[in-house]
């Protein structure tokens, strides 16, 4: 019994542990500019996001500007994951909601235009080029989806006496754009 007790007491002295790497959380800001191309041409796009990196993952929130067909401001969550030892290659996804710019009434005063936002997604692959320990330049290529709806209401004026109320004529157009994007981004942070 004494031998077993001595062995159990001395056994921890022979065990070697591996040193665990410490993974820190860091803040990162990403500013991107590029073009989005679709069936009716190309337009500039801009994105700004900030968030936290942990290991090979980045999670943040952002806002952007998309001028394809209708000017709009996407608000999105930004998720990225790096591949490889240096994490130069990465995949990204930015789901969110797109807020259209206010649309001015066009034509007669009896016409009312109203834009409504919808689903937004930008996803693809990218490659980082380290400039120094705090700065990186990245190139991305991906797919961008933007959904909007445009409601046009025509109010018919009364032109004769006695006036008979005529219900307004309402047209609703739903737009869903699938675009190919390419962006150049600057990443600041570890």
Positions of the model-derived regions?
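Sec-dependent signal peptide cleavage junction
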Residues: 15-29, 160-162
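Outer-membrane beta-barrel "beta-signal"
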Residues: 174-190
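Transmembrane beta-barrel domains of outer membrane proteins
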Residues: 49-53, 80-82, 126-128, 183-187
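Outer-membrane beta-barrel translocator/channel fold
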Residues: 65-155, 175
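Outer-membrane beta-barrel channels and translocator barrels
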Residues: 24, 54-57, 84-86, 130-134, ...
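Sec-dependent N-terminal signal peptides
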Residues: 4-13
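Transmembrane beta-strand segments that form the barrel wall of outer-membrane beta-barrel proteins
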Residues: 25-38, 44, 56-69, 91-98
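Membrane-embedded beta-strand positions in outer-membrane beta-barrel channels/transporters
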Residues: 30, 45-47, 76-78, 122-124, ...
């Amino acid at each position: 019994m004494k031998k077993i007790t001595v062995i159990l007491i001395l056994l921890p002295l022979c065990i070697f542990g591996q040193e665990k790497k410490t993974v820190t959380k860091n803040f990162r800001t990403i500013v991107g500019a590029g073009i989005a191309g679709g069936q009716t041409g190309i337009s500039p796009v801009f994105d700004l996001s900030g968030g936290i990196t942990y290991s090979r993952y980045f999670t943040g929130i952002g806002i952007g500007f998309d001028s394809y067909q209708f000017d709009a401001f996407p608000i999105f969550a930004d998720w990225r994951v790096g591949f490889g030892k240096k994490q130069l290659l990465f995949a990204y996804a930015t789901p969110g909601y797109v807020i259209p710019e206010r649309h001015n009434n066009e034509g007669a005063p009896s016409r009312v235009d109203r834009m409504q936002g919808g689903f937004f997604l930008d996803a693809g692959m990218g490659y980082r080029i380290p400039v120094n320990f705090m700065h990186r330049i990245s190139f991305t290529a991906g797919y961008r989806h933007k959904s909007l709806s445009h409601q046009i209401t025509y109010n018919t004026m009364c032109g004769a006496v006695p006036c008979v109320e005529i219900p307004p004529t309402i047209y609703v157009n739903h737009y869903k754009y699938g675009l190919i994007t390419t962006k150049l981004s600057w990443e600041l942070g570890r």
